[in-house]
Amino acid sequence: MASLAAHLDRVKNNEKINPIYDEENKTFKADGETILAADDVSGICTVLDALRRITASDKPHGDIEVAFSVCEEAGVLGSKYFDFNAFKARKAYVFDAPGHIGRIILQAPSKCKFTYKIHGKSAHAGNEPEKGINAIKAASALIMQLPDNRQSPYTTTNISTIHAGTNSTNVVCDYAEILAEARSTNDKEFEEVLQKFAAPIKEIEEKYGVTIEYNENVMYYTFKIEPEEEVVQIALKAMNKLGIEPVLNAGGGGMDGNHFNRHGIKAIGIAPGYFKNHTPNEHIFIEDLITCGKLAAEIAWSVK
């Protein structure tokens, strides 16, 4: 028994999607102004095509579960709230990854999002600046103490956003907000980096007289599937039968597979053939997409 999964949502698309058929390269591509949405409409097409092939055939197959999530692009939020007790399958195949058909994702990181809301005190910058508490200055000092960039082969961090101030230069800024993230495929390093993001807060509050509202939100946890595990071997045998060359990779972002694995369902990611997702240059190779439907069906026929 297996679950076939994909997500229904896509990133912001400027209110339109205009697919273009590129006959020379045998692809569907975006129009250069917005996304194609192959991430992850191609995953949905793959699953539906697999079901079509299975129902049209008299080949025996095990039970099949289909899981279409929402809010994946917003931080893998939708599948976080699946009722995993309702799933009977202990294997899941998530058709959501960039790359040619044959790419299998065996690992993805944990991710935590951090928010700092820094409260200072406003004052007139010309008449009585000494009565103000500058939130920007405190935020800058805080940022300099936060981990940033690659921390190790397993862990990355990023200070992504700061909001502060107004267009008026005569006001001491009383509020600033910082957004940051951390990712890691190592559980110990993930816990350590979470502590590093929290560590400077008290010192900054005391030194600059601000108050800081701090929130850390672990969005999903890492997983790693070994190549010899059954969930992988089934996919590899199906690929071999279809003449697909497998490529086993780790992914740098989260996916619905993170939550499946967290709840004891062995899950891997499979690429349906799209590239440059989330950009106006997104495209998908049509032959890869068709083959991926065949692959999903072959996997379903192989899982008893």
Where are the regions that the model predicts?
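Active-site metal-coordination/substrate-binding segment of hydrolases
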Residues: 1-68, 89, 291
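Histidine-centered active-site/metal-ligand motif
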Residues: 7, 61-62, 124, 275-279
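Midchain, well-structured core segments that form catalytic/ion-binding scaffolds
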Residues: 8-10, 16-35, 71-206, 210-221
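Catalytic-loop motifs flanking and including active-site residues across diverse enzymes
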Residues: 39-46, 135-138, 231, 256, ...
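Buried hydrophobic packing segments
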Residues: 44-54, 82, 139-143, 260, ...
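Phosphate-handling active-site elements
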Residues: 52-65, 146-155, 303
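Active-site-adjacent substrate-binding region
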Residues: 137-152, 194, 220-268
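Zn-dependent metallopeptidase/amidohydrolase metal-coordination segment
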Residues: 168, 174-176, 244-303
